[in-house]
């Protein structure tokens, strides 16, 4: 029998995809992008630090890093955890000098009607763990006496008093402090209960009052994170000693990865593994999907951020996929909670039909407004507040200025995919669902047989059946937005709206994903036109000729020729007369 040769395992650092415990990351020799230089900046900042970023952006690992750095119980592990990092060579005065208390409000399962019970249960669990870990430092019987207190507010106050008595300092971390806020945003009927919790004698307000009362004494530092500033504003007068650093330029790069950090990671793995693509080639694939977040207006034009979770997802799958580009570029868990998206859609639909912010972004490719640092829940329907909420959720990002206002765009294809997917909900009434029409087969024939008419006829039929009278009033904006949303569902293409090139603007360019579908044969550039229901056939013909001339110019641009690669480019003119497609023709 022939001897089976075992391939020698290549050593490489683990990819910390999905890991949120800093100690595990370091002890298991994972690749860690060094964010410890920010420890110095945090220590020089206000002792009560608020920081907002989109979900699944690396916040939890950053908190874990800080906890391990400041934990008085981890003194003996300082060298093993931080010795090879920046802060290991540049330690700060406060290292390993705090008792760490970590609360995660996402772990509170109770709703607003019994939020006190849920908060009490979570805090009691964390407070008991705290007392056990630091029993050798706390006064005798602290744990037993703490458990005799009636609720979380009383227990927190008691622990702060005991630490003050012993000359100890607590570093309090609160992760997802605004988790329960999603209920009020997603379900309007909860607004009254939310206000009761966050105003006046509300329990959550009382909890933050207790934190405020311990400030400057036993509660040495507080670090609060979440995804929305809404609750922060409603709690402001109860906790008015904190500083919101979410939009500060010095902390723009604290979570997420810069392109240089992504390149360094790829270069490392390419040096120890048989990569089939260069770093530049991988960046070309990743950048449109994961990059382009800017969290500070002062940083625009200098540094954009990649979603770190998505980068790790891509690298992990690229390696597991035998060094081929993964077909699935969007991690399932990255999708924003469905209820939250429904909330955004609900609020957006409450605007006048000509003032829909999401529609504006889809139609023009951008929107403008003023970025608000915080705002109360009851004023979420103010346009600037709603736009700012989209920003904090990661649905739009800063893209410079326009006519004196901040310009916002969809940051990348991961977000665009989510926005267009859920935007379809705004075009459906009573939660109707699209019939499939064997949509998968239509998409395959579009990509491999050049059969565009059945595909665009399918879109036109869906548009006609699911559009309300209010949608029809939007005219061209509605047709354009609906078509974009539908084409975004096709896995073979990345639809780009109003492609900016040297020949002008094309309405939609279906950029073929050749790196994933190497045998794809067809690509499309589409000029969408809209005319009113009463438009004559003669006027329609004139509109077609006008669109044909435009699309020929677009198709000859360098950017289109580069993107289509080996596929056949189809130049299409699609004209809607009202809500019905009147023409779908290829221009030779």
Indicate residue ranges for each PLM-predicted region:
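Walker A/P-loop-proximal flanking segment of P-loop NTPase domains
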Residues: 2-71, 79-87
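P-loop NTPase motor core
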Residues: 18, 34, 71-132
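Substrate-engagement module of ASCE P-loop NTPases
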Residues: 158-165, 193-220
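Conserved P-loop NTPase "ATPase switch" module shared by AAA+ and STAND
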Residues: 166-197
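Structural recognition of the conserved hydrophobic beta-strand(s) that form the central parallel beta-sheet
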Residues: 172-175, 205-206, 220-227
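Amphipathic alpha-helical segments of the small helical/lid subdomains adjacent to P-loop NTPase cores
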Residues: 231-238, 245-316
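Extended alpha-helical interface modules used as scaffolds for assembling large macromolecular complexes
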Residues: 242, 305-555, 583-588
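Domain-level recognition of nuclease-like catalytic cores that cleave nucleotide substrates
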Residues: 559-588
């Amino acid at each position: 029998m022939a001897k089976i040769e075992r391939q020698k395992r290549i050593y490489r650092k683990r990819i910390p995809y999905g890991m949120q415990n800093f100690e595990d990351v370091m002890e298991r020799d994972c690749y860690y992008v060094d964010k410890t230089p920010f420890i110095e900046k945090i220590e020089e900042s206000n002792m009560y630090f608020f920081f907002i970023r989109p979900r699944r952006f690396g916040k939890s690992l950053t908190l874990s890093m800080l906890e391990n750095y400041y934990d008085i119980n981890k003194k003996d592990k300082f060298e093993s955890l931080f010795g090879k990092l920046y802060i290991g060579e540049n330690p700060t005065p406060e290292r390993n000098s705090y008792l760490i208390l970590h609360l995660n409000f996402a772990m509170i399962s109770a709703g607003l009607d019994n939020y006190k019970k849920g908060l009490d249960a979570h805090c009691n669990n964390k407070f008991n763990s705290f007392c056990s870990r630091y029993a050798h430092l706390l006064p005798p019987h602290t744990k037993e006496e703490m458990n005799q207190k009636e609720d979380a507010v009383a227990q927190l106050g008691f622990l702060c008093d005991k630490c003050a008595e012993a000359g100890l300092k607590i570093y309090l971390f609160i992760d997802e402090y605004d988790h329960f806020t999603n209920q009020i945003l997603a379900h309007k009927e909860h607004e009254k209960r939310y206000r009761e919790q966050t105003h006046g004698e509300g329990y959550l307000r009382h909890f933050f009052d207790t934190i405020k009362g311990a400030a400057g004494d036993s509660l040495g530092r507080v670090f609060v994170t979440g995804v929305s500033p809404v609750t922060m504003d409603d709690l402001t007068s109860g906790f008015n000693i904190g500083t919101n650093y979410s939009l500060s330029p010095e902390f723009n790069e604290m979570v997420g990865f810069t392109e240089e950090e992504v390149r360094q990671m790829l270069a490392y793995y390419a040096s120890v593994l048989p990569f089939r693509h260069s770093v530049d080639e991988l960046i070309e694939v990743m950048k449109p999907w994961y990059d382009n977040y800017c969290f500070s207006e002062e940083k625009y034009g200098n540094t954009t951020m990649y979603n770190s979770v998505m980068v790790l997802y891509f690298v992990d799958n690229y390696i597991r996929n035998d060094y081929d580009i993964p077909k699935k570029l969007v991690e399932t868990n990255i999708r924003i909670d469905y209820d939250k998206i429904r909330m955004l859609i609900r609020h957006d639909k409450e605007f006048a039909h000509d003032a829909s912010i999401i529609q504006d972004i889809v139609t023009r490719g951008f929107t403008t407004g003023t970025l608000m640092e915080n705002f109360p829940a009851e004023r979420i329907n103010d346009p600037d507040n709603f736009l700012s909420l989209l920003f904090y959720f990661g649905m739009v990002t800063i893209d410079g200025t326009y006519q004196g206002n901040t310009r916002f765009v969809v940051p990348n294809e991961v977000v665009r995919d989510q926005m267009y997917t859920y935007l379809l909900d705004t075009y459906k009434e009573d939660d109707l669902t699209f019939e499939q029409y064997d949509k998968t087969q239509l998409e395959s024939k579009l990509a491999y047989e050049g059969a565009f008419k059945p595909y665009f006829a399918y879109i036109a039929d869906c548009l006609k059946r699911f559009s309300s009278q209010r949608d029809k009033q939007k005219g061209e904006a509605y047709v354009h937005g609906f078509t974009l949303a539908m084409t975004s569902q096709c896995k073979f293409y990345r639809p780009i709206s109003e492609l900016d090139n040297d020949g002008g603007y094309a309405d939609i360019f279906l950029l073929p994903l050749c790196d994933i579908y190497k045998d794809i044969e067809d690509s499309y550039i589409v000029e969408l036109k809209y005319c009113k229901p009463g438009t004559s056939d003669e006027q329609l013909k004139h509109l077609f000729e006008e669109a044909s001339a435009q699309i020929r110019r677009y198709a000859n641009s360098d950017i289109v020729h580069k993107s289509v690669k080996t596929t056949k480019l189809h130049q299409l003119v699609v004209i809607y007369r009202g809500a019905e497609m009147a023409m779908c023709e290829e221009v030779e």
